[in-house]
Amino acid sequence: MITKDNSSKIIRGFTLIELLVVIAIIAILIGLLLPAVQKVREASAKATCSNNLKQWSLAIHNYHSTFGSFMPAAVANPNRISWPVFLWPYVEMDNTANKYDKTLGFWQPNNTIQNTHNGVCSTTAKIYYCGSGRQDAKWQGDSYWRARSNYVINWGPVRMPLLGAAPQTYSPWGYTDFSNRASPRISNLDKFPDGTSNTLAFSEVLMHDNDAAADFRGDFINDDTQCGRFMTIDTPNSGVDELSGGWCVNDAVKMPCIVSGNGKIAARSRHSGGVNASFCDGSIRFVSNSISLVTWQALSTMNGSEVFDPNY
């Protein structure tokens, strides 16, 4: 009987050239897939951001249903309460709202415990942050550590303070003049001659990556001046330097600023081409960086009677 001897069979491996070809093919596939993955990730982040703005917009209407008016942007005297505090009960943050002591300033115990994140104001929530950025950003620029947010209210085409401008023409929110700590004005749905669908409510800002940096963009629990607001003096993601009045860290690429002047903070995001914005009727729209300044400013007033192209 004749048998075949397989002991001498040679098993040949890949040659170096073949390995290089395989690696090159894999690299090409990765290169083709990465942009698609990044687009999906950004689309998801953008959708999350839009949903968060929707929740804030619903909150102001629920507040209005309860009190017959929108919340003030800030109440200076005696305890300096900023707008998020009024809306916590309407964004499923009842526990935080119940722990916050409205008889004390936001910087006082137990609202804020100096140099720690143990105070009520340090409580963070997903609704504070856009999916394109950090989900835990906090302010550590002074002793009173607190949460920050990508979401801020419309302050209109004016700097802070309002410098004597008639406030009812501009932002729909009650305001506190920084120079004299005046009582806030209250707005309701009867005071929107321009229409709630044509009046901005919220949009986005970028925050500095370093919590310890004294950059108050997104410092929305602080009632002072620019904190927690955006202005429409410049279009979204403008390359024009923002004026901080002393509290910003310049990032010439995404967050340009000058540490001087009366405050102006532009709407900004990491989304490609523009920012998400909510309107006072609860609708959410993506606003392009290329929107005309005239239209952008018209959208930020509640009683300006401006005429603009609705197809912005």
Predicted regions and their residues:
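Surface-exposed loop/linker segments characteristic of extracytoplasmic
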Residues: A43-Y312
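N-terminal secretory signal peptides that target proteins for export/translocation
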Residues: M1-K9
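Generic hydrophobic-segment detector
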Residues: T3, F14-I17, V21, L58, ...
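N-terminal single-pass transmembrane signal-anchor helix
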Residues: I10-A45, Q55
